[in-house]
Amino acid sequence: MFRGSIPPLPTPFRRGRLDEEALRRLVERVVQGGSHGVSVGGTTGEPGTQTLEERKRAIEVVLDQVAGRVPVIPGTGALRLEETLELTRFAKEAGAQGAMVIVPYYVKPNQEGLYRYFAEVARAVPDFPLLIYNIPGRAGVEIAPKTVGRLRRDFPNIVGLKHSSKDLEYLSHLFLEAGRDFLVFCGLESLTLPMMSLGAVGTIAATANWLPKEVALLCEKALAGDYQGARELHFYLLEANEAIFWDTNPIPLKTVLSWMGLLEKEWRPPLGPTTPEVEERLRRMAERYGLLPKEKEAA
């Protein structure tokens, strides 16, 4: 179903509005770079700063540009269940191949509350594949492996989970509860290979917006059992993977993409530009990976 590298696209803005032309450029970069899917509206896309209509339009643009070449898995989660249901239904009707639903943030629900929340979403789109998005650092709560296993048994359309945490022990318990065929994706760039060695089927890594070919190849080698080749790519990508988090994601990502001419260096409040010191580190990193146009390297 879903596997490999599925880059989470940033949302490009121009003068405060969705920059559809830039979004199409980003889609082409990752698809032509060999990515195995595309995600829009995840953490990297700043969904919490957008209206539902803006999020819907971004999904439409990405689906139109992808044109069926690879699966599109939008992030459709929101704090309010009603908004999550509306956006998930929209993604399905628009032609997406699945949706990624974040663990509700800020309110810190208990495990029964999380079960009921995801059960409502699964019931609303019974034949539509769903990935749970586990990101405790942002959500303030983690969905337990036992809760995921219960959801998987009760709702066949809950097919996988994106794990954005350094806790690798979690994965072992998750596979025991949800089954070895549960589709787990790494959500922390530098842990792609370690998670895939435990059974994850791919990564949803922001680094793939910079280096789509290399991230896709790492996943392909790991899935084929070529761990020596995958390790070489793991260490090659390490600095870029770490650079994503030199400031709050997607600030470093968008900074470098703006230098590459792919989007404007623009965020929605409360996000803002990084420090000159981080910019200089990013510039040196981007030079080492050959990401900058020649005039930028000389600047």
UniProtKB/Swiss-Prot annotation:
Swiss-Prot/TrEMBL keywords: Amino-acid biosynthesis, Cytoplasm, Diaminopimelate biosynthesis, Lyase, Lysine biosynthesis, Schiff base
Database matches in InterPro entries: Aldolase_TIM, DapA, DapA-like, HpaI_NOT_DapA, Schiff_base-form_aldolases_AS
| Alphabetized SUPFAM superfamilies for the sequence | Aldolase (SSF51569)
**Where does the record place the site Part of a proton relay during catalysis?**
43, 106
Enzyme class name: lyase
Q: Which Gene3D superfamilies match?
A: Aldolase class I
Enzymatic reactions: L-aspartate 4-semialdehyde + pyruvate = (2S,4S)-4-hydroxy-2,3,4,5-tetrahydrodipicolinate + H2O + H(+)
Quick check: keyword Manganese in the entry? no
| Domain of life (superkingdom) | Bacteria
Example GO BP: diaminopimelate biosynthetic process
Q: Name one GO molecular function term.
A: 4-hydroxy-tetrahydrodipicolinate synthase activity
Q: Which GO terms describe its cellular component?
A: cytoplasm
Q: What EC number(s) has UniProt assigned to this enzyme? A: 4.3.3.7
* Classification via Pfam families: DHDPS
Give the matching HAMAP family: DapA
Q: What does this protein do?
A: Catalyzes the condensation of (S)-aspartate-beta-semialdehyde [(S)-ASA] and pyruvate to 4-hydroxy-tetrahydrodipicolinate (HTPA).
Q: Which family does it belong to?
A: Belongs to the DapA family.
Question: What is the protein name given in its UniProt record?
Answer: 4-hydroxy-tetrahydrodipicolinate synthase
What is the native source organism of this protein? Thermus thermophilus (strain ATCC BAA-163 / DSM 7039 / HB27)
Whichever gene encodes this chain, its name is: dapA
